Swiss-Prot record:
Compartments (UniProt record): Nucleus, Nucleolus
Name listed for the protein in its UniProt record: ATP-dependent RNA helicase dbp3
Function comment: ATP-dependent RNA helicase required for 60S ribosomal subunit synthesis. Involved in efficient pre-rRNA processing, predominantly at site A3, which is necessary for the normal formation of 25S and 5.8S rRNAs.
Domain notes: The Q motif is unique to and characteristic of the DEAD box family of RNA helicases and controls ATP binding and hydrolysis.
Pfam families with a match to the protein in the record: DEAD, Helicase_C
Length: 503
C-alpha cells in the first residue's frame, strides 16, 4: 500500500510494498486469513506535511543542526530527505492535544528530531543511539498519532494496533508509564505485559488495548494460549534490539513478527549497537528501512558519553568496600545529601552483601538484582526514584534500559565482564543532556580489561591513571567457547538460544 510524503511543496509517492521484497520466512498469509485480518479498517497510510516554520529554515541551519548532534541518516531509497523536527512547534498540527505532555521538555532530543519526520511519513526506521537519548517518545509519538489518524482508537477482541517489545520488565514498565500519559489524553489504551506476575489481569487488559508494551517471553506465551491476536498490528517497535538478542530472544521475536501482517506493517527498531545479529534481524523483517545514527560508528569500539566524567581508581580487592563507603560519604553531604547514586556489583551475592553493609552505615539504600521478585524490584526502583532511597545497589540487570532521572553518580564496585557493559553501566548518569560522573574501582583481577577500558577513556578524552596503564594497553581478542579466537568466522547468531546465567 502506497505511502504519501509531502515535502516542501512536492509530493513523493514510492511504490507499493511487495511481500517478495522481504527476506523473512513464514510471512505469507493465506487469502482466507488475510480476509479475516482485514475485518477491521486498517490503520491509514501515513501522510506527513512539513510545517511552514520548518520549511522557512535555511539549509545551512539544518546542516549545522545535523553536524552539531552527529546525526547521520542513511536511506537507500530515492525519497527526498526529510528535515529534522528541531522544535516542538515543527510537529504536525493535527491532533495537537497529544503534544500536551511535551510542555515539560524544552526541545526534542537528536534521535527524536531525526526520526519523527520519517516515522510520521510511514517509513521503516532503524534508530541507533545511546540509552537515555529519548527513544521512547521518538517511537511513541508517531505510534499514537498513527492510531488517531486511523480513527480506530477503540480496540476489541484482544487485537492491538501497535506492539512495542522490550528486553526487560523494568524497561517495559518505563515505556508504558510514558506512553500512557500521551494515550490518556486521547483515550488510547496502553497495557504492559511481562512475566513474573499472574496472567489473568493481563488477559483482561489485552481485550481493549490499542498499544501493547511487552517482553518477548510473556507476549509469546499469551499469543500461544490464544489470549492475544497480533493479526491487526500495523506498528511494531523492537526497543533495545541488541539487548534482546543478547538475552537469547531471537527466535521468540521472529515467531511473534511472523504472526503479524506483512505488507501493511510499519516496523521500527532501536538499538545501542549494530552487530551482525541485529543487522540480520532488520534485513529479515524491515522494508527499505532508513537508518538514523546519533554519534559515531555503532559497529566500532564502544564509546562512552562524553558528558560523563570518568574516574578510575586502582585498588586492592579487599579495599573496595571501605573505599565505596568513603566515596558515598564524600558524595552525599551538604547540598548533595539527596543526590542519587547507582552502585554496580557483578554478582547477586556481592550486591546483597554491599547493600547490607551500606545499610549498617546508615545510608538510605535499596537493591535490585536477579533474586528479587517483580514486586520487590518495583518497590526498590520506586524508592530510588522518589528519593526514599538515595543509593541503589544493582547488578547488570539494571545496566541497560532503566530510565532513572537525575542519577548524579555511578560507582562500579566490581568491573563488569565486558567493556560494553561498562559503557552501559555508566550511561545511567549524564542522561538527557545533563553532565554525569562515574567512579570505577579497578583491581588486578580486572587487568584483562585494562586495554579496552583505556581505549574508552581516551576516546572520551578522560584521564588515564598511571596505575591502570601498568596493567597494559593490549585489547584481548574476543574468543568463543567453542570456536576460540576464530569465532567471528562462524555466524553463531542464526540460532540464538535463551540461556539464563546465574549472576
Amino acid at each position: 500500500m502506497a505511502k504519501r510524503v509531502q515535502h516542501e511543496g512536492g509530493d513523493y509517492r514510492p511504490q507499493k510494498r511487495s511481500k517478495n521484497e522481504r527476506n523473512g520466512e513464514g510471512s505469507k498469509v493465506s487469502p482466507s486469513a488475510e480476509a479475516i485480518r482485514n475485518e477491521l479498517d486498517p490503520i491509514s497510510d501515513a501522510t506527513y506535511v512539513q510545517s511552514p516554520a520548518l520549511g522557512d529554515l535555511s539549509q545551512i541551519e539544518i546542516d549545522q543542526f545535523l553536524a552539531k548532534h552527529c546525526i547521520k541518516v542513511t536511506d537507500s531509497s530515492e525519497a527526498p530527505p526529510l528535515r529534522p523536527i528541531i522544535s516542538f512547534s515543527h510537529l504536525p498540527s493535527s491532533f495537537s492535544k497529544i503534544y500536551d505532555p511535551l510542555s515539560s521538555f524544552s526541545s526534542p532530543t537528536p534521535i527524536q528530531s531525526a526520526t519523527w519526520p520519517l516515522l510520521f511519513a510511514g517509513r521503516d526506521v532503524i534508530g541507533i543511539a545511546e540509552t537515555g537519548s529519548g527513544k521512547t517518545l521518538a517511537f511513541g509519538l508517531p505510534c499514537i498519532k498513527k492510531i488517531l489518524d486511523s480513527g480506530k482508537v477503540k480496540r476489541k477482541h484482544a487485537r492491538p494496533a501497535a506492539v512495542i517489545i522490550s528486553p526487560t520488565r523494568e524497561l517495559a514498565m518505563q515505556i508504558y508509564d510514558q506512553l500512557s500519559k500521551f494515550g490518556a489524553s486521547v483515550d488510547i489504551r496502553v497495557t504492559c505485559i511481562y512475566g513474573g506476575v499472574k496472567k489473568d489481569e493481563q488477559r483482561e487488559a489485552l481485550k481493549t488495548a490499542a498499544i501493547v508494551v511487552a517482553t518477548p517471553g510473556r507476549l509469546k506465551d499469551l499469543q500461544n494460549d490464544g489470549s492475544v491476536d497480533l493479526g491487526k498490528v500495523k506498528y511494531l517497535v523492537l526497543d533495545e534490539a541488541d539487548r534482546m538478542l543478547d538475552k537469547g530472544f531471537e527466535q521468540d521475536i521472529k515467531d511473534i513478527i511472523r504472526s503479524m501482517p506483512d505488507s501493511k506493517r510499519q516496523t521500527v527498531m532501536f538499538t545501542a549497537t549494530w552487530p551482525p545479529s541485529v543487522r540480520d534481524l532488520a534485513a529479515t523483517f524491515m522494508t527499505s528501512a532508513v537508518t538514523v545514527t546519533i554519534g559515531g560508528d555503532p559497529s566500532a569500539d564502544p564509546r562512552a558519553n562524553t558528558r560523563i566524567k570518568q574516574v578510575v581508581e586502582v585498588v586492592k580487592p579487599q579495599e573496595k568496600e571501605a573505599r565505596l563507603v568513603q566515596l558515598l560519604n564524600r558524595s552525599q553531604r551538604g547540598a548533595a545529601v539527596c543526590d542519587k547514586v547507582l552502585v554496580f556489583c557483578l554478582y547477586k551475592k556481592e550486591a546483597v552483601r554491599v547493600e547490607r553493609l551500606l545499610r549498617t552505615k546508615n545510608f538510605k539504600v535499596a537493591g535490585i538484582h536477579g533474586d528479587l521478585n517483580q514486586h520487590e524490584r518495583f518497590k526498590s526502583l520506586e524508592a530510588f526514584k522518589t528519593g526514599a532511597a538515595t543509593v541503589l545497589v544493582a547488578t547488570d540487570v539494571a545496566a541497560r534500559g532503566l530510565d532513572i532521572p537525575s542519577v548524579k553518580l555511578v560507582i562500579n564496585v566490581t568491573f563488569p565482564l565486558t567493556v560494553e557493559d561498562y559503557v552501559h553501566r555508566i550511561g545511567r548518569t549524564g542522561r538527557a543532556g545533563a553532565d554525569g560522573h562515574a567512579i570505577t574501582l579497578f583491581t588486578e583481577t580486572d587487568k584483562a580489561q585494562s586495554g579496552a577500558l583505556i581505549n574508552v577513556l581516551r576516546a572520551a578524552k578522560q584521564d588515564v591513571p598511571d596505575a591502570l596503564l601498568k596493567f597494559g594497553t593490549t585489547v584481548k581478542k574476543k574468543q568463543h567457547g567453542a570456536y576460540g579466537a576464530f569465532f567471528k568466522d562462524v555466524d553463531t547468531s542464526k540460532s540464538a538460544t535463551k540461556i539464563v546465567f546465574d549472576e
